[in-house]
Amino acid sequence: MRPDVISSFAYNKIMKFTRTKKVLFTNNKGGVGKTTLAFNCAMSFAKQGYKTVLVDLDPQCNLSRLSLGDNRYEKTLFASQEKDVYDVLKGVVEGGADIDLSVPFIPVPDSNNNLSLMKGSVNLSLYENILVTAYGQAAAGQQLGYFQTSAIDRFLRAKGLDDEIDIFVIDTSPSLSLLNQIIFLGADYFVVPMMPDAFSVQGIENLGSIFEKWKQNWKVTGKALSGNTESKFVLSGDGLFIGYIVNSYNVYGKQPIKDHRHWIEELPAKVKKYLSEKHGRNGLVEKSWKTPLAEIQDYGRIPAKCQEIGVAIFDLDPALVEEIHLGTKENIEKSKDEFGILSDRILKILAEY
């Protein structure tokens, strides 16, 4: 194995939690900044000393591109030694083998050696193809179905234990696909990024109801029929909603513009009814809807530049975009505060629940 591949995990440490935490950033609505939020939040975890792995489960691989930067990502596409999530699943998809636990994570720079990536793959669609049959088999209590549907979750659990990972931050495509259903049923927690607009407010009911349907269906079928099946092959289906993020609000005089403020004020009631009360637990029910985990402003062209070179918004050199974006330095400083609040609140929840 190449030294640069294992460098981020080449030392022993005491885990921050009693077990590895799997946090899913999810929304079936595209354009809400889910991938950008996941990356920047994970980088913030890493800089605070949490051993974190980004897991790219979107066949479009946007998280991989953002984490590595355009140039480095494109080089990995043609490097046979660079493994991705499909290499993990290939034996399960093609038959005759199980998940490949030897597939390494790729270190992400500028993270205090605490952040790595499970690179995405366009071939994830091949895994989704077998899920159509596999989920039906698992729902009927058949062993092959459990084996195939649990593949990603088993990989994360095993690597989390072996590599002493504190947090997996998982990104998926903006859809309600069967692949995303399987990922959702394996997650410990989920966060929902939203835009301050009418479409996000309207979409909360649909999203919360579908998540509830997924959980309930699995509870009365695959989980109920699992019998003596080893627990690691049975998805938990108990993902806890820990909060929402208001992303890309526009500012005027350091406050959200009037139209965005209106929709921000509409969100809590919907979140309470369709997400917190259906997918929360104990004291977290109220905490998860009363206020967002964070409000992240629209940073204009800054995120695009960050993707090009593979850095977090708060780590960007202002000189790289100052000529085309006035106020860049001030915005980058503000992003440190906003993502600091977001990561601190999530970490506190992970410690308590």
Task: Please report, for each region that a protein language model flagged, where it lies by residue.
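P-loop NTP-binding core
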Residues: 2-353
